[in-house]
A protein has these predicted regions:
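Short helical patches
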Residues: 1-4, 12, 118, 184-187, ...
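Conserved SAM-binding loop
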Residues: 3-127, 137-151, 162-164, 205-206
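Hydrophobic anchor at the start of a short beta-strand
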Residues: 42, 156-157
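Residue-level signal for beta-strand positions within conserved beta-sheet cores that form or flank
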Residues: 59, 133, 155
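Short glycine/proline- and charge-enriched loop/turn segments
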Residues: 124-133, 173-179
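A C-terminal cap/extension of S-adenosyl-L-methionine-dependent methyltransferases
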Residues: 158-206
Length: 206
């Protein structure tokens, strides 16, 4: 619940009336439900059929499949969010084209991405849970994101850390390695990653 509130603060950073919000990769709809309760006009896209059905029941609205992104009209949304989704996209060029198209003027695209230059990524190496092989098709850094969007009309406004992610990813990494006390060790590594990121700027997720 805390993480959902933090996500909403990032996505809706200023007071807007009747915000039209699209969450791509919405899962079972928890973030969209919170946004709906806050007065947003919500739309979701989810590739997993089971998760999509749960979200539709929870939100009482139709959740789109990824293929339906191309059918969304131009200038449809004030905000588009992708929480750990872009790294799963096979065709980045086409995806970004549609993101530009469906955003309104002065609209915002919010991306959350695992950062493979973070301390926890370097610590766990190939066991880092956020690599999520083979589902993660792209491993992106702050530099690569800037380069990808350099050729678009979208402008990078700000980069903010998702500080809770370092703990979650570190605990998962410990579990993948079948280590004892994975919860405690993950918390310690997540804390150390955040501490180092305060100097380096390389947070576990951005």
């Amino acid at each position: 619940k805390i993480n959902i509130k933090n996500k909403f603060k990032v996505a809706i950073s200023r007071q807007l009336s009747a915000v039209s919000l699209l969450d791509i990769g919405c899962g079972v709809g928890d973030f969209l439900l919170y946004a709906k309760e806050k007065g947003c006009d919500i739309t979701g896209i989810e590739p997993n059929n089971d998760a999509r059905k749960i979200a539709e029941k929870k939100l009482n609205c139709k959740i789109l499949s990824p293929e339906e992104l191309q059918n969304i009209p131009d200038n449809a949304f004030d905000v588009v969010t992708m929480w750990h989704v872009l790294e799963h996209v096979a065709d980045l060029k086409t995806e970004i084209h549609h993101l530009q198209r469906i955003l309104r003027k002065d609209g915002r695209l919010i991306l959350a991405l695992p950062n493979h230059k973070s301390y926890d990524a370097e610590y766990y190496k190939d066991k880092w849970a956020a690599y999520d092989v083979p589902r993660h098709l792209n491993h992106l850094s702050q530099t690569s994101i800037r380069n990808i969007f350099k050729e678009t009309k979208l402008q990078l406004i700000d980069t903010k850390p998702l500080k809770w992610d370092s703990f979650y990813i570190s605990m998962l990494s410990e579990q993948y390695m079948n280590k004892k006390n994975s919860f405690i060790k993950g918390l310690l590594t997540g804390w150390k990653s955040n501490r180092k990121a305060r100097k380096s700027g390389e947070w576990s997720s951005l």
